[in-house]
Design a protein with these regions (language model features):
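Sec-dependent bacterial lipoprotein signal peptides
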Residues: 1-30
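Conserved active-site regions of diverse hydrolases
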Residues: 32-336
Length: 336
């Protein structure tokens, strides 16, 4: 019996006598006279759930800074073809995890010839939308050969924040707590249906250009602190609710990693962690490396890899790259 099946039996609150009866009577013992090594986890399908931080549009555009296809120029060097986007360049975090297992999403095959992943995430979606996303999975039923990637909650936090000051801070904190716990329960349900699950908490958007601007535009310098509190309460309650046996769910603290990138930008080769790189005339997902803001001397012009934020809320490829590295490492090394 796989370690994951043992984990699921345990979460169902069965008696161990009943489990033993099921094992012996149902033929679930797979070997006798000795054990064997647990095989490395090798999923055959990847599923992306969440909001725009995990979306690849049908035409390959992402809610970040999109890159162009590279072609060989007249001098024999690679140059960008400004007429053709390349969805495999500057990947978002879910693509990094898929690549770690040799999988590819149907909306961005890259060099793959067969799709082995589905993007169920949708722009603007919130915690309450996750069940419908799961129901939208096409093909085989969810199982142990699937890996599910989840990052959700940014739009919940923004929706809750928008109620201030009509609702008090304490009321908003209570709402964030409830949404976070609801997400944790939904993720548990997903994990118990079979797939390995990798979860990213909501990035710390209190450090985003949007939050920093709120301190000024509202005349209230504590607005970003309120957003920080909402993010923290939401993420803390999601993680508290998750099944914590080490085998069903792998958790990445994207909020803490965002804080690290802002506090120690040079460690991540970042030159700007406070401003949006994309021009206002090229809203996501229409932003490309050709629609970035002009340089404001003495600072250098933004690039996809040196600025943290694509727009006032969404991460650049640099941010996605770091989160993708962490998520891929967790997915590969977690004992699913």
């Amino acid at each position: 019996m796989s370690s994951k099946l043992f984990a699921r039996l345990g979460t169902l609150h069965w008696s161990w006598a009943a489990v033993f009866s099921l094992i012996v009577g149902g033929g679930l013992l797979t070997a006798c006279g000795g054990g064997g090594q647990i095989e490395p986890f090798k999923p055959s399908r990847v599923l992306a759930f969440g909001d725009e931080l995990s979306v690849i549009e049908p035409d390959g555009r992402k809610y970040s800074i999109n890159a162009f296809k590279q072609v060989t120029g007249s001098g024999g060097t690679l140059v960008d073809d400004p007429t053709t986007l390349d969805c495999a360049r500057d990947p978002i975090w879910v693509q990094a995890v898929a690549s770690a297992f040799g999988l590819a999403f149907d909306r961005c095959l890259g060099t793959a010839t067969v799709a082995s992943g589905q993007v169920l995430a949708q722009v603007g979606h919130k915690v309450s939308d996750l069940p419908a996303q799961i129901l939208g999975v096409q093909g085989a039923v969810l199982g142990e050969k699937d890996i599910a990637l989840v990052m959700l909650g940014m739009n919940d936090i923004l929706e809750i924040y928008a109620e201030y000051p009509r609702l008090s801070r304490d009321a908003l904190i209570s709402l964030a707590r409830a949404r976070g716990r609801a997400l944790g329960r939904l993720i548990n349900d997903l994990a118990l249906r079979g797939p390995a699950v990798v979860v990213l908490t909501v990035p710390d958007i209190s450090l985003s250009p949007f939050a920093l601007a709120q301190n000024t535009s509202t005349g209230d310098p504590t607005r970003s602190k309120l957003i920080f509190d909402l993010v923290k309460v939401f993420n803390d309650n999601t993680s508290i609710e998750l099944i914590n046996d080490g085998r069903l769910i792998g958790l990445i603290y994207a909020d803490i990693e965002t804080q690290n990138m802002v506090e120690f930008p040079s460690s991540f080769n970042l030159s700007n962690v406070t401003a949006a790189a994309c021009k206002d005339t090229a809203p996501l997902p229409n932003c490309t490396t050709a629609t970035l803001k002009d340089a404001v001397p003495p600072a250098a012009a933004p690039t996809a890899t040196s600025w943290l934020w694509a727009d006032d809320l969404r991460l650049s490829p640099a941010g996605h790259s770091r989160l993708g590295q962490l998520a891929a490492s967790r997915a590969v090394n977690n004992p699913f």
